[in-house]
Amino acid sequence: MSETEAAPVVAPAAEAAPAAEAPKAKAPKAKAPKQPKAPKAPKEPKAPKEKKPKAAPTHPPYIEMVKDAITTLKERNGSSLPALKKFIENKYGKDIHDKNFAKTLSQVVKTFVKGGKLVKVKGSFKLSEALKAKAKKSTPKKAKADGEAKPKKSEAKPKKAEAVKKTKAPKEKVERPKKEKKEKVEKKKATPKAEKPKKAATPKSAGKKKATPKPKAAPKSPAKKDAKPKKATPSKKAAPKKAPAKKSTPKAKEAKSKGKK
């Protein structure tokens, strides 16, 4: 190659890419001064709502109802939950106003089992020994309470009697003078009777003495005596028949006297 040969033309280097333009800085906006907020008017305190008192349950507590159901059903292996529910609804249904009664009963029974008040046996429930002992102790107390209540009634009766006596007492005081007047009048009436001569009564006594000889009609008595033995069958009562024979002797004497004449 000759020196005169031209050097190879070198392409001009590509111009360097202009550097990425830096983001323009935003001019800070002039913030308007905050206006102070007007103070809020104080809220008036609300009147507290009156809480309605919860109506006291008219039924006994659940433990008492469950205990009553188990003791009255007297099932050997315990009472199931449906049996307890049925018994309680039949006996206390009018007093139970809980819509979720079945759910609350199942929850209550579970808590009683955890607390040791009930014993679960294959889906049935029995009373624990502690509850059985309490049930036995509670029965004599009721009997004693009934016995103590009866004497109170008897003690109250004498008070009424005393009150009646007190009310009657003033009436007697008012009536006493009337009785005394009546007694005076009766005494005055009785005195003229005593003045009557007793001699007038003596002839009556004499008349009575004369009337005494009525026993002459005694001979009729044998007929009555004869009538009585007819009713009596025993032979011992037949003996009175001899009596008329003795009394017939006067007739025989009269016959003898006539014969002598």
UniProtKB/Swiss-Prot annotation:
One Pfam family cited in the UniProt record for this chain: Linker_histone
Region feature Disordered, mapped onto this chain: 1-63, 125-261
Sequence ranges of Basic and acidic residues compositional bias: 41-50, 143-198, 251-261
Domain spans labelled H15: 58-129
Region (7 X 5 AA repeats of K-K-[AS]-T-P): 136-250
Protein name, UniProt field: Histone H1-I
UniProt xrefs under SUPFAM superfamilies: Winged helix' DNA-binding domain (SSF46785)
GO molecular function: DNA binding; structural constituent of chromatin
